[in-house]
Swiss-Prot record:
Cystine connections: none
Any Pfam family: Ferritin
Source organism per UniProt: Helicobacter pylori (strain ATCC 700392 / 26695) (Campylobacter pylori)
Taxonomic lineage: Bacteria, Pseudomonadati, Campylobacterota, Epsilonproteobacteria, Campylobacterales
Binding site for Fe cation 1: H25, D52, E56
Protein name (Swiss-Prot/TrEMBL): DNA protection during starvation protein
Length: 144
């Protein structure tokens, strides 16, 4: 797979995760509602930024980003969540798994971009990896 193709898959993943985390944000139940509501808002905002950054990088590489949800659904590898009631521990476990998946995908992006001599995408991917690894560490500590 080429760099721009991985970017498109990640763009699809980002928009699906944006919606998935909104579902958690709106439908969390329990005594820690306020904390989880705030935390999930921060997370879905990160996915919105990621979606836009990925699209802009795709354009910079001379390709067209995803512009429809139907395209995103075809390309995503993220499992959508259709339930509408959640407890915080389940939410954070699911987000942790999604972060681990993204970590793997951004490593692939970094390696592929490196092989193609695309230093800008390598830097972007490595920056995302640093953020994801910190988030993974924090969620693992929270769930311990």
């Amino acid at each position: 797979m080429k760099t721009f193709e991985i970017l498109k898959h990640l763009q699809a993943d980002a928009i699906v995760l944006f919606m998935k985390v909104h579902n958690f944000h709106w439908n969390v139940k329990g005594t820690d509602f306020f904390n989880v509501h705030k935390a999930t808002e921060e997370i879905y905002e990160e996915f919105a930024d990621m979606f836009d950054d990925l699209a802009e990088r795709i354009v910079q590489l001379g390709h067209h980003p995803l512009v429809t949800l139907s395209e995103a659904i075809k390309l995503t590898r993220v499992k959508e969540e259709t339930k509408t009631s959640f407890h915080s521990k389940d939410i954070f476990k699911e987000i942790l798994e999604d972060y681990k998946y993204l970590e793997k995908e951004f490593k692939e992006l970094s390696n592929t971009a490196e092989k193609e001599g695309d230093k800008v995408t390598v830097t972007y991917a490595d920056d995302q990896l640093a953020k994801l690894q910190k988030s993974i560490w924090m969620l693992q500590a929270h769930l311990a």
